[in-house]
Amino acid sequence: MGTSLTHPDSWMVGPNWPNRGEIDIIEGVNLNTYNQVTLHSSPGCVPSVGSGGQTGHNIGNADCGAGGGFTGCGRESNIATSYGTAFNANGGGVYASLWTSSAIKVWYFAARDVPANIRNNNPDPNSWGTPIANFAGCNFDEKFGSMNIVSTCPLAKENGKLTWHEIFDITFCGDWAGAVWGSSSCAGSNPSCE
């Protein structure tokens, strides 16, 4: 996982952004220590915390369409090994997400805590405990869809209609990491993010 000067993330995006949504599963900048899960959509998706709760806390805007979809609505993990240098030092981990008509949930498991049903290719979200992010109360069928996953692993379509696009990238500086560069401890090691 990148640290200083970077904006690493893994996300899914639909066509005609932000109208068919974006789900940021792993995201942060510079020396952040906690992962941020963010939804971006057209205006009007104002999710609540879903049934069963979440371990993370709400951050940013209530409306996932804030700022024309650019800002989004987020949940920040409460697990110190979920991002950045602690993630790396801990040997990484596994993120799992579940997207249904009624909720979008994301779990994080440190490398040593990955459930056996995930390791054995038989995932059972009902056994994973409370997710770090649990978005509910939005019309997810309207705001999120037609997303494609680009992966080296073969994927199956569910009901023949969902395609996903998953992107993992590490942006050097960029809009977000560059904008908060001066307020991070990274600025002490380099006077600019350029």
Q: Which residues make up each language-model segment?
A:
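GH16 jelly-roll
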Residues: 1-194
